[in-house]
Regions:
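Metal-cofactor-binding active-site regions of metalloenzymes
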Residues: 1-184, 193-198, 204, 208-209, ...
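Conserved hydrophobic beta-strand within the GNAT/NAT acetyltransferase core sheet
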Residues: 186-188
Length: 322
C-alpha cells in the first residue's frame, strides 16, 4: 500500500486524539467516543465541503506543541503500519501550528522527530496555504522546504492547500516561482474545487504532481498534456465524493484517466475525516467501477514511480508489489 496524499490534520482518529489530549493535558469536548468521532469525521451523508472542513478544527487544537506534533506523527504511522502501509507521504502546513507560540520551523522539526523509528517508510510534504495576506508565511514555508529538503527520510516537497475556489491558483505564482528557483519539487491541490484552468496554472508553475485534479476532464487538450508529460494525479475517491468535488460519482473520471494512460494514483486525503483507509479506497473502486487486479497493480506502480523518494527506495517498493 502506497499513499502519496495524506494530510496530518486529517488523519487524527479517535484513539490518536485521546492520546494527544492526555499527554498535553487538554480536555476534549465530548461525552463518549461516538460524540468525539462526530467531531473528527463526517458521516456517509456529508452534506457539503463546509461540513467536511469543520472536522479540522479539533485536530489542529491538538497539534500546537512540539510534543503534540511529534506524537501525532508517531501514532498515525503506527496506525498505518497496522493497515499494511509500506510508504506514505504525510503533508501539513507549518503555519497552522503556530497558535501557541511555535514557529513554523519548530513545527517542521517536531514532525521530523516523529519519523524516527517508524515502521512505515514516511516522507513529509510542507503545504503553503491559500488565503488572504499569507504571502509572507508561505514564503517562509518555501524557505523551510528548501532548508530541510532531502531525497528521502524527511521533507521532500512542497504543496499548496486550502480553499481553491476562493483563492485562485494563479495568485500563488510568487511562492512557486521561488520554489522552482530553489529546486524544491512540488505538487499542488488543483482541479478539486475549481476548474481545469487551475490544473493548467499549477502545471505552468512547474508542478510534477496534481492533488486531486478531477476537473481536468473538462479539457481534452489538458488531458493530452498531462498524459504526454507524465504528470501524476493524486486522486482521492471518497474524499471527492464527500466534499462534493464530484457531484455525480457515476462519472468519476479515474477510469477514463487510467484508460488514457494518465498516471493516476489512489490516496486517502483525510483518512480520519473520511473514515477510510487505502484498502477501503480500493474496495470502493472495485465495487463501483469494476477495478481489476491488474489495474490495482498499475495504480500502485504509478504511486511508486511518482513518490518523492530515491530510485533505490522505489525499486524496493516495486519488489513488494505482486
Amino acid at each position: 500500500m502506497i499513499d502519496l496524499h495524506c494530510h496530518l490534520d486529517g488523519a487524527i482518529t479517535v484513539l490518536t486524539a485521546k492520546k494527544l489530549a492526555e499527554i498535553q493535558n487538554i480536555r476534549l469536548p465530548f461525552a463518549n467516543d461516538e460524540e468525539l468521532e462526530s467531531l473528527l469525521s463526517v458521516p456517509e451523508s456529508c452534506e457539503s465541503l463546509t461540513e467536511f472542513l469543520k472536522c479540522f478544527a479539533l485536530p489542529l487544537t491538538l497539534l500546537q506543541t512540539k510534543e503534540g506534533i511529534t506524537e501525532a506523527v508517531k501514532l498515525i504511522l503506527d496506525e498505518k503500519a497496522e493497515e499494511g502501509m509500506k510508504y506514505i507521504e504525510l503533508r501539513f502546513a507549518p503555519q497552522l501550528h503556530c497558535e501557541r507560540g511555535l514557529s513554523q520551523e519548530d513545527a517542521v522539526l517536531a514532525a521530523l522527530e516523529g519519523l524516527k523509528g517508524s515502521k512505515v517508510h514516511c516522507n513529509l510534504i510542507l503545504c503553503c496555504m491559500r488565503g488572504e495576506k499569507l504571502t509572507e508565511k508561505n514564503m517562509e514555508t518555501v524557505r523551510l522546504a528548501k532548508k530541510y529538503l532531502v531525497e528521502d527520510g524527511g521533507v521532500v516537497a512542497l504543496d499548496l492547500a486550502g480553499a481553491e475556489a476562493l483563492f485562485k491558483t494563479e495568485n500563488f505564482a510568487l511562492e512557486f516561482g521561488e520554489a522552482k528557483k530553489l529546486g524544491v519539487p512540488f505538487t499542488i491541490h488543483a482541479g478539486e474545487a475549481d476548474g481545469w484552468q487551475s490544473v493548467k496554472t499549477a502545471l505552468d508553475f512547474g508542478a510534477v504532481r496534481i492533488g486531486h485534479g478531477v476537473r481536468a476532464w473538462q479539457n481534452e487538450d489538458l488531458l493530452k498534456y498531462i498524459e504526454e508529460n507524465n504528470i501524476v494525479l493524486e486522486m482521492c475517491p471518497n474524499s471527492n465524493r464527500q466534499t462534493k468535488a464530484v457531484e455525480d460519482m457515476s462519472v468519476y473520471p479515474l477510469r477514463k484517466f487510467l484508460e488514457m494512460g494518465i498516471k493516476v494514483t489512489v490516496n486517502t486525503d483525510d483518512p480520519a475525516i473520511c473514515r477510510t483507509t487505502l484498502q477501503k479506497e480500493f474496495e470502493f473502486l472495485r465495487k463501483n467501477y469494476g477495478l481489476t487486479k491488474a489495474e490495482e497493480k498499475k495504480l500502485l506502480l504509478n504511486a511508486i514511480d511518482a513518490a518523492f523518494t530515491t530510485e533505490e527506495n522505489k525499486e524496493k517498493l516495486r519488489n513488494l508489489i505482486v
